[in-house]
Amino acid sequence: MWSEKEKGCMKMKVGFIGLGIMGRPMAKNLLNAGVELLVSDLNKEAVADVVAAGAKEATYAEIGEQCGRIIIMVPSGAISKSILFDEDGVASTIKEGTVVCDMSSVTPVESKECYEGLKDKGVGFVDAPVSGGEPGAVAGTLAIMAGGDQEDFDAMKEYFDIL
């Protein structure tokens, strides 16, 4: 469980998983805004680039354990579910009170499965696909279409404002 002292954009570590065409500039925008970021991606060149900008590399389990807010930006819902629920995935170490935001393009069924699987652990989930492409990701002007419980949306809003 996260204490009140640990909550808030500039106080809580944020995990960012998926540093592709969209995710890499999104992660850099968060870093530029002063967010402490732990990152993971299969592409080690992308990880090295974002680490050079100030992030720290971490495994999925380390992100689950250390981060109060977690953003996922990967190509599919199947990948999101694997990142979350595989044996050494984010959910294996996640703390109650954490909020996970999947910004990938996923089906409603996949989103609901993630929501339900995390809710059982006392973890919030926001489904928040984006529009604006790479130029919007670089400029920090993405249109974000978020769905989830109000308190979880509120927990992610200050990050959405950066993205």
List each language-model region with its residue ranges:
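Rossmann-fold NAD(P) dinucleotide-binding segment
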Residues: 60-125
